[in-house]
Amino acid sequence: MTVLQLPKWSLSIGDGQPLFCIAGLNVLEDIDLTMQTATHLKDVLTRLELPFVFKASFDKANRSSIKSYRGPGIEKGLAMLAEVKQRLNVPICTDLHEAQQAEAVAAVADLVQIPAFLVRQTDLVVATARATHKACGLLHVKKAQFLAPWDCRNILSKIKEAADADFTILCERGSSFGYNNLVVDMLSIDEMKMLGAPVTIDATHAVQLPGADGVFLEFHPDPDKALCDGPSCLPLSGAEDLFRSLKAIRAAVA
């Protein structure tokens, strides 16, 4: 399986590498809360000697209600993420929703995420692949809930043809099981790894960690007051204990 690197940050993900931790907020709220969360997670993961990429979305474009909080938007959101990156010296992960956002997002984010619902959108995939490769970043592609793990081969092929390079991390986040329900088929992780890409698992939605190369986790200092997906967020105060356990599990199964 391919081991991918972010040379600027001396980070690697793949077989034999430390547990790769993409962690942060579901959505950006304000700069103070963002800095509080990023600082705490950096301190925890530095102590545990685990690679850390700070994640936060600038726009939650698929909220169920038009009245729901979506985020600060691309211009203000990317400025906030750039400030976190500069002040804390940490790599950034964020997602995008439209092809025309690719260049701007790739200029700030080291790990550019394509949301699960959008992975079949060829124009978005191609534009994101080209912009991210040009910026020397990595792609983080969430497997759609309606896709079989082996169908990710087609997504990887599009990216390869668009950018002529292998720089994609796949993410397992569950599969549709009837209406309004998700299940996690643990075989999916190995199935996707057999496609040649490292695999993370969105553990705050899937709540499992069997053999993945990394984790994608969303935290909040006070989940009950989070402006988006509070019930799916983990309390920031528990981050160190959780990552310490995950590090031990990774060491035991490696």
Regions found by a protein language model. Give the residues of each.
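N-terminal amphipathic alpha-helix/helix-capping segment at the start of soluble metabolic enzymes
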Residues: M1-C21, A79, A251-A254
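Active-site beta-loop-alpha junctions enriched in small/polar residues
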Residues: L25-L28, S57-A61, H97-A99, F117, ...
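Alpha-helix-loop-beta-strand connector modules within alpha/beta enzyme cores
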Residues: L41-L48, K67-C93, T128-L138, S188-G196, ...
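Glycine-rich, proline-tolerant flexible connector loops at the mouths of alpha/beta enzymes
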Residues: C21, L25-T34, F52-I74, H220-P231
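Catalytic beta/alpha-barrel core
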Residues: G71-G73, R87-Q101, D110-L124, G137-P149, ...
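Catalytic alpha/beta core domains of metabolic enzymes, predominantly
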Residues: A131-F219
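Structural preference for beta-strand elements that scaffold enzyme active sites
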Residues: P18-I22, P51-K55, N89-C93, D110-L111, ...
